[in-house]
Amino acid sequence: MKSLSFLNHEFEAFPSPELALTDPNGLLAIGGDLRPERLLSAYYNGIFPWFNSDDPILWWSPDPRAVFIPGEIHISTSLRKYLKKQPWRITINHAFTDVMAGCAQPREKQSGTWITQEIQMAYRELHHTGHAHSIEVWEGERLIGGLYGLAIGQVFCGESMFHRKTNASKAAVAALQQHLLKMGFKLIDAQVMNPHLESLGAKAIKRIDFITLLSELRNNPVDPTTWTTKEVILELE
């Protein structure tokens, strides 16, 4: 039976994602807090927070789930040609706080953002403990795009991306895919399908299949140098 759980500030296990509501799709629990242990427990179990600044904390596990397989993200020929011409520089974990701030800026035709100050503080803490990571795209010394997310074993859980110049966020996605492939990652969680993700090659899979994949990959070790601060040279041949 589908049911909505209410969490308090005592740390407790999340309910099974299979109990999430169908309307709204995937809403599983309300309340709790954003302490690192709770956030990591959420992602470890296929759950993520998503709420507006005037809402309580809402926890989600939608069905279906949007995912990418590293190596299958679509980088068009025209985009490859475009990126080859750009004098951009791409880095990993060089400016996590600035990337989050960029992602938090309201989009066109939007008045607010779900990446509240509370969310930013929580994920900065996860970054400091080595769980949350960013990809940055630079033009000179100016940050023009990027993305951030969490690494759970061989799964990268993408959270948000932004751009200040055309295709800069796509450059970040291309760099992420290239890096994850080299480091042996098997899955990218993109959470909720939308036309933009679909155009890049995202697949919608059943929640139960996502949870199964996650359970197989979340404890797999990765190279300890995966998320050291470094520059990425895009290979676009």
UniProtKB/Swiss-Prot annotation:
* SUPFAM superfamilies cross-referenced by the UniProt entry: Acyl-CoA N-acyltransferases (Nat) (SSF55729)
Keyword line: Acyltransferase, Cytoplasm, Transferase
Instruction: List membrane-spanning regions.
Output: none
Q: Listed GO molecular functions? A: leucyl-tRNA--protein transferase activity
What does the entry list under GO cellular component? cytoplasm
User: Where is the protein found, in the record's own terms?
Assistant: Cytoplasm
One biological process term from GO is: protein catabolic process
EC number(s): the record gives: 2.3.2.6
Its recorded reaction(s) are: N-terminal L-lysyl-[protein] + L-leucyl-tRNA(Leu) = N-terminal L-leucyl-L-lysyl-[protein] + tRNA(Leu) + H(+); N-terminal L-arginyl-[protein] + L-leucyl-tRNA(Leu) = N-terminal L-leucyl-L-arginyl-[protein] + tRNA(Leu) + H(+); L-phenylalanyl-tRNA(Phe) + an N-terminal L-alpha-aminoacyl-[protein] = an N-terminal L-phenylalanyl-L-alpha-aminoacyl-[protein] + tRNA(Phe)
Question: Which HAMAP family would you find in this protein's record?
Answer: Leu_Phe_trans
Against NCBIfam families, the record matches this protein to:
aat (TIGR00667)
State the function annotated in the UniProt record. Answer: Functions in the N-end rule pathway of protein degradation where it conjugates Leu, Phe and, less efficiently, Met from aminoacyl-tRNAs to the N-termini of proteins containing an N-terminal arginine or lysine.
Family membership noted in the UniProt record: Belongs to the L/F-transferase family.
The family database entries (PANTHER family) matched by this protein are listed as: LEUCYL/PHENYLALANYL-TRNA--PROTEIN TRANSFERASE, LEUCYL_PHENYLALANYL-TRNA--PROTEIN TRANSFERASE
**In its UniProt entry, what is this protein called?**
Leucyl/phenylalanyl-tRNA--protein transferase
Organism name: Shewanella baltica (strain OS155 / ATCC BAA-1091)
